Amino acid sequence: MQNTELLLKELTLEEKCALLSGAETFKTRGMPKHGIPQIWLSDGPHGLRKQAGESDHLGLNPSVPATCFPTASAVANSWDAALGEEIGAALGEEAAAQEVSVLLGPGLNMKRNPLCGRSFEYFSEDPYLAGKLAAGYIRGIQSKGVAACPKHFAVNSQETRRMASDSIVDERTLREIYLTGFEIAVKEGHPRSIMSSYNLVNGTYANENKHLLMEILRDEWGFDGAVITDWGGSNDHALGVKNGSTLEMPAPGGDSVRELLAAVESGKISESDIDARLSELLPLVFDTKAALDAAPREFDAAAHHALARRAAEESLVLLKNEGSLLPLAAGSKVAVIGDFAKNPRYQGAGSSMVNSTQVDVLLDKLIDSELNVIGYQQGFDRHGKPDAALQKSACELAAQANAVILCMGLDEIAESEGLDRSNLLLAQNQVDLLQAVAAANPKIVVVLYSGSVVETPWLDNCQALLYAALGGQAGAGAVADALIGKVNPCGKLAETWPLTYADIPSAADFATRRKTVEYREGLYIGYRYFTTAEKAVRFPFGYGMSYTTFAYSDMAADEQGVSLTVTNTGSVAGTEIVQLYVAKKNSELFRPAKELKDFARVTLAPGEKQRITIMLDDKAFRFWNVKANRWEIEGGEYELLVGASVEDIRLCEKISVHGTATVHPYEDVDLDCYYKGNVLSVSDADFEKLLGHPIPNGKTKIDRNLTLGELNHARSPLGWLVWLVLTILLDVSYKRGKPDLNILFQYNMPLRALAKMTNGAISMGMVDGIVMELQGFWILGLVRVIYEAIKNVVLNAQMEKRLRGA
């Protein structure tokens, strides 16, 4: 392995600067003269997406075959970090086989609002659960010599305007909700890299945010790896390098190199800043390349498919089972209805889309099972178009069966990178079908496919509801076995399912197209809000049924944790997920009514009992004191609550905890709405009290960060024309039921990304000329663009000639 210190002495400043940006869409720069290899980076979080031909960052072009595991949102329902580690190891093995050094995942965004179109890529609304699962994935991936790259750091909760939105969040909420998952992942998973998010956080882009990248990530958590930009996510490359950003991707060309050289010359940054970033990048390059050179070029596809199936089994959640309709008895005459039974929906759209090695089909698995499948009907148009003939045929088939298996869900474009959902509803034609089929045969099992929450006002029309989530390429076999009892579904929800979307604290303002995204609800996302506000939900966080039952007893507790006995009181084997929550009554702080602090899985045979221990760590009682600017503990009496869900608390013990807090964080500040959890409509005044400063102005500016979707604000006919064309194309794609992801990306893309995504064809100087044009300086802007274009071509050619020998 190369000695980084010696290598830094050999490299010229220009060569050093060149190494800090990519060469191609998914490749870093190599310098053979200095023995520095080029390495591959690749999506994705639940399956490798290495494109053999022309590469893109949106999943538009085909990739090499790989195993598609259940999405993070599905695996989270298993509450099994060890399973995550197994999946991670398989992902790492496939990445190594394809010579990929950095795998871009897992996703750790907090599920602030279920309309986020990319929720299927993320684990949970709870940072502790998300962090534990992510740490497992990271350990698994890196066990194969491949670097994991958890993402998107940080406070990135919507796809709308994702490259230029400013997340306005108070420091306590930032620390306790949006950073804790990353903290756990970094400290317990030790990732070699981490991906910064597109957005700003409190006025500064995440990728150049010293508070995030240096003070917290490196100084507090001890991270010593590489920070990699999201694709096209660099704003000020020099400031990013100074404040902790290591590698700019994908391929900004020579302009990025010249930006760093000019910054060193002007004193904006120093060569030691460049060296510090290379000291993070080069060990990753050499270590992963050496591991990959020794790795096999093949993997056991059958074994990985089997793992994907087991993961899908553990991730199934039984949400309803009226009259114990499930499991279905062998020989039962069943009608299979629904397009998803024949054409599976098993993954989301966008950069995580995998070209699966194989895909199981539920209808085929049911036909091969012990059930008597009397027929199949499509039942509904997948994309929502009403079809009376399909519905009529389905009802006729249902009337002949002992039971109906009805497969419902969201279609492919409903959940995607680059696009937020418009509502939580299933297509009306599916709901109409369910109601019609229920009139013909009430014994209905709904198998539901989605990557996130859906509203279920139709729940009374079915006797059983099995949530299959997005179960990956082997999910169909898991569902079939669960329906007949070969598998006992024991998963539990990793996010709250509300009665209606309007019940969610951020509902009124999501997903805003304003520049500022105001996190007015503070700590109260997911169950933290619903339990504090005592608001009813459809299915609570941590909820899930089973074909058996469990009893909890004999709890003992202290500051280190709890122990208790769990007994399988039913007639079949099963796995229980025991959850430990912490609550503090009469707190001097505002805080959620209860918070998850650990959990345990226990698998028991009928009648078997087991004593389990659940430990508490350094995060159990802490809060971020905004006045003292540190983690502290409020002393006093706490309740340790053990339950089968956040609402189904079985056992409780009180303990006394010694405090460390020396100053009240909100002394003389009236935050009554936060103490009561009344955060559905937080006033400007109350939010400013929480922030400790005025709410930033979100007014649109015509500058490098103006998005193409905001060109209607331009003072130029050219800008209006581009905006009009993009808007029309977007509207047409929506009306067709297939929004164009490429157009959506462009619509939400800031002008500066033109210089970051075009492999050097467009420079930032050319972007500045375009900005002048849009500001109304038409002739000067055009002259600037032409001048900068010529200059860019000449300078790029000169630089590449110098670097070619490197």
Features from the language model and the residues they span:
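Charged, amphipathic alpha-helical linkers/stalks
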Residues: 646, 653-723
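Terminal connector regions
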Residues: 618-665
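A broadly tuned "polar low-complexity/structure-edge" signature
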Residues: 40, 71, 247, 357-360, ...
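Glycoside hydrolase catalytic-domain context in secreted enzymes
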Residues: 1-619, 623, 637-641, 646, ...
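Extended non-globular C-terminal regions
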Residues: 721-806
